[in-house]
Amino acid sequence: MAVREVAADQERRDQALTACCMAVVAESDPVLAPGRRSRLLMDCLAVLRAAHRPERAAQIGMKEFRQGLRGPLGPLLPPASGRPDRFDSMELFDAQGLARDAVQDLCSEHLVPQAALEQYWPWARVRAEQEEQRLFDVMRRLSPEEYRRARTLLGTHAAGSVRELSRQWDRLWMRFDFFESVADWPWCQVDGWWYPCPVCRWPMRAVRSGPQFDVRCEAHAPRGVHYRYTLSKGPGPGELTGTGKAAVAVTPLPASSDHLAVNRHVWRYGTLPVLLELQLRDELAGLPFLEMQMWPGEQRPDEYDLHITVAVPGKSKRHWRVDAKAWESVVALGKALTARPGLRRGLTIVLPDHQHSERHFLASQVRDQGVKVTTVSCLAKRVKDACGAPR
């Protein structure tokens, strides 16, 4: 199949995936008026049909659409061309009938901003890589020293009280407009409280499950950051009980206007990658023959994130130029990377450990550009081996 035809098929598949994600968001929004929900679902159905061949589009009515959203997505998507992806078997609702945490990120990462969509969805929506770019456009205006400070703060202070955040961000505080009030985010509130993830400090999602709530970090639940919340019988917060191996004790904070958090895009594409970089730095710290530089560029500190050098006497030096990524979809990440002008050869893209099984898919997309793909744990083992240190 010609390259142009493969690209067109992939665009139609992205369009259908976007429609499904948007429909799930509409279906699961508890405050959306029924009339508004119906109109949004009709919009989504129109976009989905437009992605299919006419004979298949005629077979998908509203009943088939809504039923299809409750199971694996394969029957709703145009066939994949070339290398298969994971979306045929993906389900957007969980076992409790609630939208999966990642739906919003998948939607923004696969959104096709073209006229065919805009005629159905006139509201402004921005591709994920454009939001990522907006963040780093602000960052690039900082001096190298300020840039490194801001990147670190995105990882360590992405949410909290206004007093604490302004103290930590200090002179950088007034230069960022990415913070929003937790009081405006009902999805993370329970009994007037919110719980920061012990890993990223961002608000954890609270989902009612019978008389209790499931509380989990959207990004770190695979690592065991999830809890069960029991409603309080009196004043004050209820009881939060860990249900995962990484569910350490967390202090509840009031869901008031003086508690802020970076917006979702900054958390996904700013905070989470920094945490991967800091995790890697901390795991490798103290190894013999090792030198590490965080955001090393003086002219362009954002060129890549971490430079690792291993210089064992009598052996050739080993270098890793690391760029951490925390996209929900490695398919969309691969397309964004291949479209990026001047992608540096010799770069190593590092993914979270829970995307280990997907790293080969991304590697196949960027291999021709001289870029390698691995995960945090795999790279840490490789560097330790190069240093001659025990794993």
Go through each PLM region and give its residues.
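Beta-rich nucleic-acid/ligand-interaction surfaces
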Residues: 212, 298-309
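Acidic-basic catalytic patches of nuclease active cores, encompassing PD-(D/E)XK
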Residues: 240-298
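A structural signal for short secondary-structure junctions
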Residues: 299-301, 314, 341-344
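Conserved catalytic cores of phosphodiester-cleaving nucleases, focusing on short active-site segments
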Residues: 280, 284, 304-334
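Catalytic cores of nucleic-acid endonucleases
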Residues: 324-372
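Metal-dependent nuclease catalytic core centered on acidic motifs
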Residues: 94, 137-145, 250-255, 357-365, ...
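Nuclease-adjacent, charged terminal/linker segments that flank catalytic cores
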Residues: 3-250
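C-terminal helix of von Willebrand factor
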Residues: 372-391
